[in-house]
Amino acid sequence: EEVRLERGEPDYMADVQWHFIGHLQTNKLKMVLPYVSLVQSVDSVRLLDAINAWGSANAKVINVLLEPHIAAEETKQGFDPEEVARVMKDAIDGKYRFIRFQGIMGMATFTDDESVIREDFRRLRAVFDEARRSSPLFTDDFSEFSIGMSDDYRIAIEYGSTMVRLGSMIFGERNY
């Protein structure tokens, strides 16, 4: 909710592709989905079903990244890695006609211990690779591996990250 899209944007904004990152509440879909090119943080079947229903009602296919939960913190959202395989099977069976699965987004445990971060990224990579292997449907579109943030992006790149999130590096630390 930090970014408000307003009517009458300057012409240079026409080519901007907005990604939504963070926990998306189902009651906020109508405020977000019309404006974004990718939802990077689909963290539950409930949210996936709601996005698919919104896409059906609005005749729009929504691009998403699935967010598996592999970090040590219980406060982080996400699918169990085994749930990702079930979602992929449901997609193959045609359940999600208004969703284009484009990859995986994940976060490592918030720690200074590089070995923990590496293990988290290794596990995320395994989930990503298994999802890609699960069906030929996903080999082309399912190509985004969004891991890494300002503190660990260099390690993420070693593990094949295709997108990194550098908000703190660019804008500074948040003050809550």
Give the location of each predicted region.
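Conserved alpha/beta-domain cores
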Residues: E1-D151, Y159, F171
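Active-site-proximal glycine-rich helix-loop-beta segment
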Residues: G160-T162, G167
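Short, charged, intrinsically disordered terminal tails
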Residues: E173-Y176
